[in-house]
């Protein structure tokens, strides 16, 4: 049996989405900036997709800017806001458990004179709001806290973050790549100025995403050289993928209630099974305020990579963390930030369920996981010493 439990890394393209995309590879191949018929046809398709994305998050169509994905959108916000607001100051604040797209860009900005404050989180992964209040100065130009964490699934109190930032007139960005399509996202309700998203997280194509930019806020251009995306991001529009993103997000929102309920029930069944059948294991992140799909565990006395390899041989596909950094041998910065000891963080696995997973698949995964953990622990000197003591 093959069981795919890595939907936080990526999802397949829904057949309904692919069906909408295919004509734009062939007969509807126009450049959306061309003035002739096939170009106008392409422009209409892009406008429709922009409207679909806007409607999904309660934004205006002219507040949606298509990008190559979530990482590009995150990078754009950090660099663009710092550039456009340099006269005010050179300080930004982000959480200590942001995606690597944010963390790496923030580190790069530090090398170029930007002061970055990293907010602590508690054991559930929730940001320290008191620290945020105290960290804001008259030179702070941006606060960025992800809506939902990509590793442990924790859903952050973004409205509280916005409330604090707005008291001081500071712009707010949220990386909602894991949230959009999975839980309701309303930019007006949240109050954010910027929001990142990526189509391949909600059964759309890879290589396309979007950045919500609230009308009137100051941000620099991402790419110069053309008039695409209202002259903010030059480059020929990725037509078929943009069409696919629009269709995918519309379907995701339409089916969200039903899918979220079923996935949450299945995930809770899985979590209960793991905690009941396997000793020396901890669930990472908050039990309730987490994404429907997410279950992240740390298995003591064994390495996560060994667990993953054994699961893969049995047909179960999961992750040891974010797919963008899964090749690293370093323990997850997110797990360390929530207080997981280094030696235990190394034994962590993220399972992320999708809309097609079944109870039969979860039962199979539980059986395989129990066997794998037992077998690996028998070979672990640390585990054997612990048993003797």
What is each residue range found by the language model?
Residues 1-389:
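Pyridoxal 5′-phosphate
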């Amino acid at each position: 049996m093959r069981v795919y439990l890595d939907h936080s890394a990526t999802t397949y393209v829904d057949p309904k989405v692919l069906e909408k995309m295919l004509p734009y590879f062939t007969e509807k191949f126009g450049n959306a900036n061309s003035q002739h018929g096939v170009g106008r046809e392409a422009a209409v398709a892009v406008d429709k997709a922009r409207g679909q994305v806007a409607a999904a998050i309660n934004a205006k169509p002219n507040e949606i800017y298509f990008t190559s994905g979530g990482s590009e959108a995150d990078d754009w916000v950090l660099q663009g806001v710092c550039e456009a607001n340099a006269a005010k100051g050179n300080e930004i604040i982000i959480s200590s458990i942001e995606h690597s797209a944010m963390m790496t860009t923030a580190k790069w900005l530090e090398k170029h004179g930007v002061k970055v404050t990293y907010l602590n989180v508690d054991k559930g992964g929730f940001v320290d709001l008191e620290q945020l209040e105290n960290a804001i100065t008259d030179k702070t130009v941006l606060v960025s806290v992800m809506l939902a964490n990509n590793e442990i699934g924790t859903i952050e109190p973004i409205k509280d973050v916005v409330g604090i930032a707005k008291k001081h007139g500071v712009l707010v960005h949220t990386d909602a790549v894991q949230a959009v399509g999975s839980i309701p996202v309303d930019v007006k309700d949240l109050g954010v100025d910027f929001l990142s998203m990526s189509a391949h997280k909600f059964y759309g194509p890879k290589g396309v995403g979007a950045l919500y930019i609230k009308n009137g806020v100051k941000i620099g251009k991402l790419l110069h050289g053309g008039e695409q995306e209202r002259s903010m991001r030059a480059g020929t529009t990725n037509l078929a993928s943009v069409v696919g993103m629009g269709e995918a997000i519309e379907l995701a929102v339409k089916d969200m209630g039903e899918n979220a309920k079923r996935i949450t029930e299945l995930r809770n069944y899985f979590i209960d099974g793991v905690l009941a059948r396997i000793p020396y294991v901890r669930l990472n992140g908050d039990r309730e305020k987490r994404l429907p799909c997410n279950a992240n565990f740390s298995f003591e006395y064994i390495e996560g990579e060994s667990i993953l390899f054994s699961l893969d041989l049995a047909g179960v596909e999961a992750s040891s963390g974010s797919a963008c950094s899964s090749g690293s041998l370093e323990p997850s910065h997110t797990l360390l930030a929530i207080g997981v000891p280094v030696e235990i963080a190394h034994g962590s696995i993220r399972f992320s369920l999708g809309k097609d997973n079944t109870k039969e698949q979860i039962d199979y995964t539980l059986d395989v996981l129990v066997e794998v953990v037992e077998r690996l622990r028998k070979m672990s000197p640390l585990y054997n010493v612990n048993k003797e003591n």
